[in-house]
From Swiss-Prot:
A zinc finger (CR-type) spans 133-215. Zn(2+) 2 binds at C163, C166, C189, C192. It comes from Nocardia farcinica (strain IFM 10152). The keyword Magnesium does not apply. Participates actively in the response to hyperosmotic and heat shock by preventing the aggregation of stress-denatured proteins and by disaggregating proteins, also in an autonomous, DnaK-independent fashion. Unfolded proteins bind initially to DnaJ; upon interaction with the DnaJ-bound protein, DnaK hydrolyzes its bound ATP, resulting in the formation of a stable complex. GrpE releases ADP from DnaK; ATP binding to DnaK triggers the release of the substrate protein, thus completing the reaction cycle. Binds 2 Zn(2+) ions per monomer. It is found in: Cytoplasm. InterPro entries: DnaJ, DnaJ_C, DnaJ_domain, HSP40/DnaJ_pept-bd, HSP_DnaJ_Cys-rich_dom, HSP_DnaJ_Cys-rich_dom_sf, J_dom_sf. GO terms for molecular function: ATP binding; heat shock protein binding; unfolded protein binding; zinc ion binding. The gene is dnaJ1. One of its GO terms (cellular component) is cytoplasm. Residues 4-68 form the J domain. Zn(2+) 1 binds at C146, C149, C203, C206. This is Chaperone protein DnaJ 1. It holds the Pfam family DnaJ_C.
Length: 384
């Protein structure tokens, strides 16, 4: 008597392929030996696997629907046959949601044509180059399209064929024993490296990779306002992918060189200006050779003190992709002379004498004012 394969899976005779697969996955989760060590469950798992093997095969299912039993008709033994596990994939899929590499839950092979990797170059820029922008001509060692096969990887008129090792799946599977029981593992096919295809007659120049290593000259436009550590992206200027795949991007990282005069802080520039003591006292004008505007006058007001900061608005670095510019901040260092000649010494002594006289006059006037005030206060109290 023919076995009731539909009953073993608990589905109707008119169940769809998806309904049959869902029923099998559910039972496999419950009965798999790694989950349920009971001997009765293991026997039931074999029956369920056999039923799925039969009903997932259109020809075998047709025999069942006609009242026959395909396994009794030479269709093969049930239980743990390779087909019964759908290449072991359906059991694995039942537990891990389609992560297996074979059967109904297999991943697609990645294919021979893959996107290329991104590349990174570093280039040194002066502060002036960062300020105005520049086009740097760089040399890069990268993967380029093979000019012999134009990326196909084949020689002459040969074409890729399905990998015999993995059957085109791109990966192979194995069952390993662990303390949890038998574990199914998948790994990329060692023959085709996950592509699912091999090339019987590969290109003599690139060896079937579709690309070769070469040195390229690249013109990299660097916009004004870049700073140290920034990366400029050049689309599709990276490495060509395996099989002639689309190239990745090239990133140019900025290495900003220190400047002799200016120190950068974001979009602002800082510098130190040495001002003679007399000029700081009387006021003066100094000229600063700015990065973008050349020689520019800076006014030092009379009485400027050491450490004060004078600002030139809009004379700093440009903001990236913006017309706005930062400021230039001049830190004033008042220089006191260490050596004086006789005339200079005499003049300074005269200045000191004048200053001392003025100070004495101020103090005398203040003293007289205080004396008059105290006298008025005494008179006020004595008159009471």
């Amino acid at each position: 008597m023919a076995r009731d394969y539909y009953g073993l899976l608990g589905v109707a005779r008119n169940a769809t392929d998806q309904e049959i697969k869902r029923a099998y996955r559910k039972l496999a989760r419950e009965l798999h030996p790694d989950v349920n060590p009971d001997e009765a469950a293991q026997a039931r798992f074999k029956e369920v696997s056999t039923a799925y093997e039969v009903l997932s095969d259109p020809e075998k299912r047709r025999i069942v629907d006609m009242g026959g039993d395909p396994l009794e008709s030479g269709g093969g033994a049930g239980g743990f046959s390779g087909a019964g596990f759908g290449g072991l994939g359906d059991v694995f899929e039942a537990f891990f949601g389609g992560m297996s590499g074979a059967g109904g839950g297999q991943r697609k092979p990645r294919g021979r044509v893959q996107p290329g990797a991104d590349s990174l170059l570093r280039t040194r820029l002066s502060l002036a180059e960062c300020a105005v922008g520049v086009t740097k001509h760089l040399t890069v060692d990268t993967a380029v399209l093979c000019d012999a096969c134009h990326g196909s990887g084949t020689h002459g008129n040969s074409k890729p064929v399905r990998c015999e090792t993995c059957g085109g799946a791109g990966e192979v599977q194995s069952v390993q024993r662990s303390f949890l029981g038998q574990v199914l593992t998948s790994r990329p096919c060692p023959t085709c490296r996950g592509a699912g295809e091999t090339i019987p007659d590969p290109c003599h120049k690139c060896g079937g990779d579709g690309r070769v290593r070469a040195r390229r000259e690249i013109a990299a436009p660097i916009p004004a306002g870049v700073a140290n550590g920034m990366r400029v992206r050049l689309a599709a200027q990276g490495e060509v992918g395996p099989g002639g795949g689309p190239p990745g991007d090239l990133y140019v990282e900025i290495v900003e060189q220190p400047h002799d005069v200016f120190v950068r802080d974001g979009d602002d520039l800082h510098c130190t200006i040495r001002v003679p003591m007399v000029d700081a006292a009387l006021g003066t004008t100094v000229v600063i050779d700015t990065i973008l505007d050349g020689p520019t006058e800076l006014t030092i007001p009379p009485g400027t003190q050491p450490g004060e900061v004078s600002v030139l608005r809009g004379h700093g670095m440009p903001k990236l992709r913006s017309g706005v510019r930062g400021d230039l901040l001049a830190h004033l260092d008042i220089v006191i002379p260490t050596k004086l000649d006789g005339k200079q010494t005499e003049l300074l002594r005269k200045y000191k004498a004048l200053r001392d006289r003025d100070r004495a006059e101020v103090m005398s006037a203040q003293s007289e004012h205080n004396s008059g005030l105290f006298a008025r206060l005494r008179a006020s109290f004595s008159g009471r």
